[in-house]
Amino acid sequence: MYSKYVIIISLLAVVSLGSAIEFWNPEECGCPPFDKTENEVCTKHGTTYDNRCQFDCHQKFLSKSGVALEEGPCILSAEAEEEAKK
């Protein structure tokens, strides 16, 4: 009986965290617009933020749920690589 409640509470926590990540809105941060290509910040998991302000804002938002973002290399798409070569 006890394990049934633990499973239910765990599932609710996962759903809540997923909702928090999904419903973050970068416009709520009040970050000024930047040129996207020169100021991108990326995570190890492949998420790309337009600028440092958005990354820091999302990090602060997620830290309330105990989640930490880790910076990683920005992966260029095939189109972006071709454009960079020109």
From Swiss-Prot:
InterPro entries noted in UniProt: Kazal_dom (IPR002350), Kazal_dom_sf (IPR036058)
Compartment(s): Secreted
One annotated Gene Ontology cellular component of this protein: extracellular region
Gene Ontology MF terms in the entry: toxin activity
CDD domains: KAZAL_FS (cd00104)
Annotated SUPFAM superfamilies: Kazal-type serine protease inhibitors
Tissues in which the UniProt entry reports expression: Expressed by the venom apparatus.
Domain of life: Eukaryota
TM region positions: none
Main location, first listed in the record: secreted
Keywords tagged on the record: Disulfide bond, Secreted, Signal, Toxin
Signal peptide span: 1-20
Keyword Thylakoid listed: no
PTM per Swiss-Prot/TrEMBL: Contains 3 disulfide bonds.
Family membership noted in the UniProt record: Belongs to the caterpillar 3 family.
Function summary: Probable toxin.
Protein name from the UniProt record: U-megalopygitoxin(3)-Mo3
